[in-house]
Amino acid sequence: MVVPDSGSDIQPADNGDTDKVMSNSEPELDPNLTTVELEEVRKLQDLVRQLEVQNQTLHNRSRKQVLGGTNNSNLKAGSNINNLHKVMDTSPGAEEAGNLELSPPADSSGSEDMSPLPDTSRVEEQDGFLSLPCSSGSKQTMGWFVTSNCDSGMLGASEASKDQSALDEVDVLDLELCAKAEDEDSWLYVSPKKEVVIEHGPESPLKWCRKVLDHPSPATEVACRTLINRLDQSSRWKNVYSSPSQTSEAGVSASSSAGYLKSTNKTLLTSGSSGYMGVYSALSSQSSVDSELSSDESISMGYKLQDLTDVQIMARLQEESLRQDYASTSASRRSSSASLQSLRRGTYSDQEFDSYSQEDEEDECCSLPQHLQRYSPSPHSSPRCLSPSTLAEYNRLSAPRPRLSRCSLAGGGAKSEEELRHSMPNLTPRTSLRSLEAVRNSRSMEANLQSSGNRTSCLPHSPKGASSSRMRSDGQSPLYLRAPMKALSPVGSMSALRQHAKGPPSAQVGHTEAMRRVQSPGSKNGVGYSGCRTAVVTRQTPGRGMTPASPSSRTRLPQTPRSRSLGMTKPSGHLTDESWKDGCY
């Protein structure tokens, strides 16, 4: 009879299984048990059922409590079972062997109920079960106790494994507690996302921008500083372009900025090639707008434009020397608007300087020959007037070039002033005393060298003319201080000096000196003045640097009796068209 094993087998059974076990054990007890004892057994079964219910409730409570509370409740359940065994020991039919046989099923049902109990309660329960007194002392019951004792050791081992599963359940309960804490952790983990959505979702862009502006990052501050600096630079460039009192010093200081170098490098390099330094041009209305746009582009372009300016300047110089014999009415209109704008700004153009110097010279020499005066081309034949394509190109480049223009020396009046403005170029240069002094010194040195080199060629024709040319090259007239110096290409300066050194074959010395005083020592790109080449005996030959003049320019020039008596047989209008070759390299 292996009752504990059967009890261990039926351990996971329900209450109905316990009733079946008790009913199965009842036929064995029928010949020995009375009805009273059976009633007591049923009462014990009821107590076991109550203990099962109580144990189930304790299991439910233990899931909500810590491990120590569950151990205490299990200990209480074990003490209740021990009390039940004591009641069974004090029952009236306990001396019979049937009662001893009844106890293993009852204990088996109790062990079934108390399966998740710890080892301590199990040991107490087994001790209470093994300490039951045996009043009959029969060998059979003693043998059963021995077998039950041996089986109880095996039962304890199996119950230890069951207790390990109970500890696993306790761990699961602990994990459930941790799961609750994990829910809090997950809530803490999820809540920042929800807060971010709540904060930034309904927030308007204006509030976001306000937050960024109130608390800017370092990168934002750096970007703001660079933007402010660029805006300040652009405003400074606009002030430099639009200021009426622009000097060479202001131009040099402004040229240190990156955007301004694009427009002024061309002027500096062009003037440096001809010894003309520090003269900056006033821009026309359209070219000033283009220059502002190009300066804004140069903010982003940067150093690349500065590298390209050298190549562009040399190319434009060669193109300009080849295009000087083309003219257009639109270019003259633009030049007249530029002259009006420069007059409003209070700047003096080279024509005004020439007209003022011409008025002073007319006081000394009241009448001059027509062909001894400098020819000022009309707007339609001016070499300074450009074609529309080249004008648009120059406006795009927006580089202030020192372009020269020569006006007629006719009597000053409203009509002549208007015609002077029509003969102006698109860009009129501004001058300063410092630049004029520097140019005067450099030009006087070149004139001295050139006149000394050509002295032998001038002596056979007219010694007086050569001496007067040396006097003019050594001692400068007041016109050198007043007339603006123009930027020349190297070929232009050489041709101008070559023709300047040639004297008239036969002319009065005083007349020659007077007409040399009228001459301005500079010319533009080889357009020299051959007014010196007059002869009473010989016929006027077309000079290399002579610019063909239209009849309108000849009607402007005053014709005096002295000019008629000098024997000029061929007017300058019939000159050949080969004057454009002077500007070619």
Curated annotation (Swiss-Prot):
Residues 351-365 have a biased composition (Acidic residues). InterPro entries: Slain. Residues 1-34, 55-125, 324-365, 402-476, 492-585 are annotated as: Disordered. The keyword Coiled coil applies. The keyword Zinc-finger does not apply. Residues 575-585 have a biased composition (Basic and acidic residues). Residues 327-345 have a biased composition (Low complexity). Keywords: Coiled coil. Residues 68-83, 425-434, 441-476, 549-563 have a biased composition (Polar residues). It holds the Pfam family SLAIN. One of its GO terms (biological process) is microtubule nucleation. It comes from the Eukaryota. Belongs to the SLAIN motif-containing family. This is SLAIN motif-containing protein-like. It comes from Danio rerio.
